Structures are given as structure tokens and as C-alpha cells.
Design a protein with these regions (language model features):
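Asp-box/WD-like beta-propeller blade repeats and closely related beta-sheet repeat scaffolds
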Residues: 1-5, 13-18
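WD40 beta-propeller blade core
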Residues: 3, 49-50, 93, 138, ...
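Short loop/turn segments that connect beta-strands within beta-propeller blades
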Residues: 6-9, 52-56, 96-101, 141-144, ...
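Extracytoplasmic beta-rich repeat domains
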Residues: 15-37, 43-44, 61-79, 86-88, ...
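Loop/turn-rich, solvent-exposed surfaces of beta-rich toroidal or solenoidal domains
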Residues: 82, 91-92, 113-182
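Blade-level signature of beta-propeller repeat domains, shared across WD40, Kelch, NHL, RCC1
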Residues: 92, 172, 180, 200-232
């Protein structure tokens, strides 16, 4: 179920029950405007869904990028009227919500089981999508779905800031990568010191965060902060 609340009073504005299952997922709700209609989009175990922002009415659903996945984690990426989503053991897909016969449908642009589906999410830089799936980082043409390159690495959460990709891998390593469709260009890599005692049994899943010239890295009970201002 999705619920809209008044941010000041907490009063319920609307509720929308999902078809077949009320199970929640890990990703956040994102907002977009499709065919002139403001919509809230979320990636759930029942699929990618779009709701009318005013009424909460379910406008469309796309199941393929979630079907068969035991863990729907990715926050969908919205850009220029398109939405990318992907889930473990399902695949990655790009859809475009369009009006048809007085309603909406999610028009599939492409689907590929080899596209990024990792829990670390995806980012779009220019015309290209970057994300991990299994043990590889991939660069994908956003509109065509063509894979430009793949590089073997550890599954990572990633962020784009200041012209660079910041990768925080499951094994705790942090890498700095220059985004380019021409190939993998790593600029540096390190492992934070004094990692948690449970590092052998747990995985580092927290996203890196960049703010005010600093990058923040969290793993279990530890938090590291590094100065990344130019010239430092």
C-alpha cells in the first residue's frame, strides 16, 4: 500500500492498495511528469507502478523487471520521461509511461537480464547509465540499452558527484572512477582503516555521500569522512 500524508499535520490524503500484494520494497518513491500528469513511481515486488499524484489512483504497472526476484531493492531512475528499474534474478528495463485509450500504460523500450540490477542502484551521466550487477560494473546507453562495457568488480553502491563515480563495494573498498562510455577508468582505490570487527561476515551496503567537499563512508558501526576538495 502507498499512502500520501500532509507533511504538516500528518493527515492521510489518499491511500492506494497494490494489486495482488501489499508487500513493501526497499527503494524510495520518486516523482516524475509523464504525458503531462505528475506521478509518484515506486518499484515494488509486484512491479514498477505509477500513481496519480493528486488522487493516488494506480495509473499503470510494469511487472517484468521485478518478476521472479527475491529482493526488489533498487530505487527507480527517472529521466526525460523514461524510467529505469532492475532487480536481482529478473533483469533491467527502461519504460516510458504513455497515454492510451483514456488511460496509461508503461511502454517497454528494452529489457535485458544482463543490465544493472544491483542493490547499489544506478546513476545517469549524460546519455549513459552506470550500475553494478553481480560482480561487474556496466556502462549502458540509456535510450538503446546497448552495453558499452563491463568491468569485473565487487558489487557496489554508487554515487555521481563532481564529475566522478564514487563506488562503495560490499567488501568495504572505495573506488573513484571517471565515467566514460569508452571504457573503465579507475582513478584511485582504498580500504578505510579500522573496519568493524564483523567485516568478515557482514557486507558494506551503505551508499557513499558527498556534501560540502567531503565524502562520507559508512559500514556497520563505523563512519569515515574524507576531505575531497580540489587541491587536497
Amino acid at each position: 500500500m502507498m499512502v500520501a500524508l500532509n507533511k504538516t499535520t500528518g493527515d492521510v490524503i489518499w491511500k492506494c492498495s497494490m494489486p495482488e500484494s501489499q508487500q513493501a520494497a526497499y527503494g524510495s518513491v520518486v516523482v516524475g511528469k509523464f504525458a503531462g500528469v505528475k506521478q509518484y513511481v515506486q518499484f515494488l515486488p509486484v512491479g514498477l507502478v505509477g500513481l496519480d499524484a493528486k488522487s493516488g489512483k494506480l495509473l499503470w504497472r510494469y511487472e517484468r523487471s521485478a518478476k521472479g526476484s527475491p529482493a526488489v531493492i533498487m530505487t527507480p531512475l527517472v529521466s526525460d520521461g523514461y524510467i529505469y528499474s532492475g532487480a536481482f534474478r529478473a533483469g533491467g528495463a527502461l519504460v516510458k509511461p504513455v497515454k492510451i485509450h483514456g488511460g496509461f500504460k508503461a511502454e517497454e523500450i528494452y529489457f535485458n537480464i544482463k543490465l544493472p540490477t544491483g542493490l547499489g542502484g544506478v546513476v545517469k551521466v549524460g546519455d549513459f547509465l552506470y550500475g553494478t550487477s553481480g560482480r561487474s560494473l556496466a556502462c549502458v546507453d540509456f535510450i538503446s540499452g546497448a552495453i558499452k562495457w563491463q568491468e569485473s568488480t565487487v558489487e557496489s553502491s554508487l554515487l555521481f558527484a563532481d564529475g566522478r563515480l564514487y563506488l562503495h563495494a560490499e567488501n568495504g573498498e572505495v573506488a573513484l572512477v571517471e565515467p566514460s562510455p569508452d571504457g573503465y577508468r579507475e582513478k584511485g582505490r582504498f580500504t578505510p582503516p579500522n573496519r568493524p570487527a564483523d567485516q568478515g561476515t557482514s557486507k558494506a551496503w551503505a551508499y557513499p555521500v558527498v556534501a560540502d567537499g567531503r565524502v562520507y563512508i559508512r559500514e556497520s558501526t563505523r563512519l569515515w569522512c574524507y576531505d575531497i576538495k580540489a587541491g587536497k
